[in-house]
Amino acid sequence: MQKYLPVLRSCPFFTGLTDDEILSILHCVSAAKITRPRGSYIFRAGDSTEVMGLMLSGSTLVIQEDLWGHRNILSKCSTGDFFGEPYAATPGAILNISVVAEEDCEILLLNVKRLLTSCPTACDHHQKLIRNLVSVLANKILLFNEKITHISKRTTREKLLSYLSAESIRQASLSFDIPFDRQQLADFLCVERAAMSVELSKLQKEGLLVTKRNHFELSTR
């Protein structure tokens, strides 16, 4: 695990921990590294899990799919991001999401039950870890609340403007990249891609934004 320490150090989950403490925790919870090719499923809806995933490299999409193949993207996970933690922390919980590799990826699987069970000596770094996990879960709730704000808008135009405005504020710039391609953005906002493309074209003609692929430049005029 030594080679992944640069990634682990930058992860909010390990905030305030030394390299030795991080390695000790990984050993304590029997952390396991897996690799998955693009398009493969890490978690499938209908299953249950005792582990959560930490992205070491590559990216995954957290999605919901119906029987007819309609896809709703809940979030995208890149290096240093987590997925599956609410389900792993709830014994017997059935996944209503799937996690699929957007590209070849390496993932660290962590047993949440062991993470939530303090060591016999109640080691200080384990207590820090539990506090960090609570913070990670709280941040995930905020992200989902933000998505609800976007998709609760009545029109495709309003959903786009809500999302792009939030991204601009989050990145503190009127010029920014988003983590989605056009189809993924449509799936994330729960709109039809064709209708979204029409609205983006209108917004450009109105001078409210300029976009190319996943790059956007907003105008406040």
Outline where the language-model segments fall.
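Cyclic-nucleotide recognition modules
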Residues: 73-131
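Cyclic nucleotide-binding regulatory module and flanking cytosolic helices
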Residues: 1-38, 87-90
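A small-molecule sensor/coupling module
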Residues: 22, 95, 113-155
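Short, small/polar residue-rich loop motifs at catalytic or cofactor-binding pockets
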Residues: 28-29, 47-49
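Phosphate-/nucleic-acid-contacting segments
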Residues: 154-221
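Short phosphate-coordinating micro-motif centered on Lys-Gly-acidic
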Residues: 41-47
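Glycine- and acidic-residue-biased ligand/ion/polar-headgroup-sensing regions
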Residues: 39, 50-63, 78-80
